[in-house]
Amino acid sequence: MSGTLSQGSSPARLTLWEEENFQGRRCELMSDCSSIRELSGFRRVRSVKVESGAWVGFEYPDFQGQQFILEKGDYPRSTAWSGSSGYRTDQLLSFRPLLCANHSDSRVTLYEGENFQGCKFELSDDYPSLPAMGWASKDVGSLKVTSGAWVGYQYPGFRGYQYVLEQDRHSGEFRKYSEFGTQAHTNQLQSIRRVQH
């Protein structure tokens, strides 16, 4: 089944290459792919072009490991998708489209403690530094995505581990930091932004 974004939008489409700079064999995706090795025989994916929609690329098969948000555009090498994250991987092995593409009214609520306890902070815009905007801690224990999709980052300035947080996953409720992603080993979340299409 192809990833559907929202009424009136085109289906998600992603083109992958086995080597950097769009070289070598290529493969096109329009829906979830739990293992690019099994689907195409690729050893790894080293360059990506997002034709439409937004996608999440994962370091390992079965949507495991570090997540990288892939918004519309070209990613000729791994530094293009990992940016200044501080965490680098030279390959992506599984992919899925984001299904909630209407970000005109994106909203998320951060909570200090697990299970939506403690101080809360409601957001509807990008925040390159949560501490600078009034969040008293560098940690987020839980969060609720009311609408849209967000990328949370471990450090200010949209750096560090990336956590893709969608209303359509966990019903938008992330009761503890380990639900942010399979690689979430800390509840440090210090910057957050809306996914762009």
Curated annotation (Swiss-Prot):
Species of the source: Macropus fuliginosus
Swiss-Prot/TrEMBL keywords: Eye lens protein, Repeat
Swiss-Prot/TrEMBL domain comment: Has a two-domain beta-structure, folded into four very similar Greek key motifs.
Location of region: Connecting peptide: 100-105
Described function: Crystallins are the dominant structural components of the vertebrate eye lens.
Complex formation: Homo/heterodimer, or complexes of higher-order. The structure of beta-crystallin oligomers seems to be stabilized through interactions between the N-terminal arms.
Region (N-terminal arm): 1-11
GO biological process: lens development in camera-type eye; visual perception
Ranges of residues in domain Beta/gamma crystallin 'Greek key': 12-52, 53-99, 106-147, 148-196
Protein name per its UniProtKB record: Beta-crystallin A2
InterPro entries: Beta/Gamma-Crystallin, Beta/gamma_crystallin, G_crystallin-like
Family of the protein in this entry: Belongs to the beta/gamma-crystallin family.
SMART domains according to UniProt: XTALbg
